């Protein structure tokens, strides 16, 4: 059988867990998703109100959890909170394997992946910009890249659900936080945007 991945499909993380990015899956991609990815969760970052009917049927038949995080652009009001929602999903190992997709797999997913690269993988700004440009066909949206660079968060994440790939950056944050605190609760990690970029 021939498998066809969705537009702009690529792995983001493939270590202890699998996180993928893409454009909107079409029916010709469903076999690939079913037989190659074995997804538990799909996060749609976009402006469509609801999934297409056949897509909804596919999600239900495969028992894939579907989350819609509305995003028109990185200029949206409330975008900070929406990115935090995405991070909460990505930082819970029980949701994996995960596919994060937008309509074309370029700008909106590029913002999400850029934030993941920055906060959870310690990538440099140059690396994030280069990857963003590759998937957007060389069209680098200065507003998106500025949003990624300036993005800050302060999420509390239960330690027992954090995927292995994110633990190193979270550990570095804990060391920084511990220098100025006597709190030794130990049950949560705090995700901050303090990695050098």
From Swiss-Prot:
Keywords: Cytoplasm, Hydrolase, Phosphoprotein. Coiled coil: none annotated. GO terms for molecular function: inositol diphosphate tetrakisphosphate diphosphatase activity; phosphatase activity. InterPro entries: Prot-tyrosine_phosphatase-like, Siw14-like, TYR_PHOSPHATASE_DUAL_dom. It is found in: Cytoplasm. Residues 10-160 form the Tyrosine-protein phosphatase domain. This is Tyrosine-protein phosphatase-like protein OCA2. It comes from Saccharomyces cerevisiae (strain ATCC 204508 / S288c) (Baker's yeast). The lineage of its organism: Eukaryota, Fungi, Dikarya, Ascomycota, Saccharomycotina.
């Amino acid at each position: 059988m021939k498998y066809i991945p969705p537009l702009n499909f690529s792995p983001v993380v493939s270590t202890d867990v699998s996180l993928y990015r893409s454009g909107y899956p079409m029916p010709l991609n469903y076999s690939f998703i079913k037989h190659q990815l074995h997804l538990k969760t799909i996060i749609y970052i976009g402006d469509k109100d609801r999934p297409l009917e056949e897509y909804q049927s596919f999600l239900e038949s495969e028992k894939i959890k579907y989350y819609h995080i509305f995003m028109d652009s990185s200029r949206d009001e409330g975008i900070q909170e929406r990115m935090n929602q995405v991070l909460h999903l990505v930082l819970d190992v029980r949701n994996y394997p995960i596919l994060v997709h937008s309509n074309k797999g370029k700008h909106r997913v590029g913002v999400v992946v850029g934030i993941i690269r920055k906060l959870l993988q310690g990538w440099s700004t140059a690396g994030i910009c280069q990857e963003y440009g590759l998937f957007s066909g060389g069209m680098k949206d200065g507003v998106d890249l500025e949003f990624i660079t300036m993005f800050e968060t302060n999420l509390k994440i239960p330690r027992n659900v954090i995927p292995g790939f994110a633990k190193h950056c979270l550990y570095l944050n804990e060391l920084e936080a511990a220098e100025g605190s006597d709190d030794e609760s130990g049950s949560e990690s705090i995700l901050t945007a303090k990695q050098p970029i």
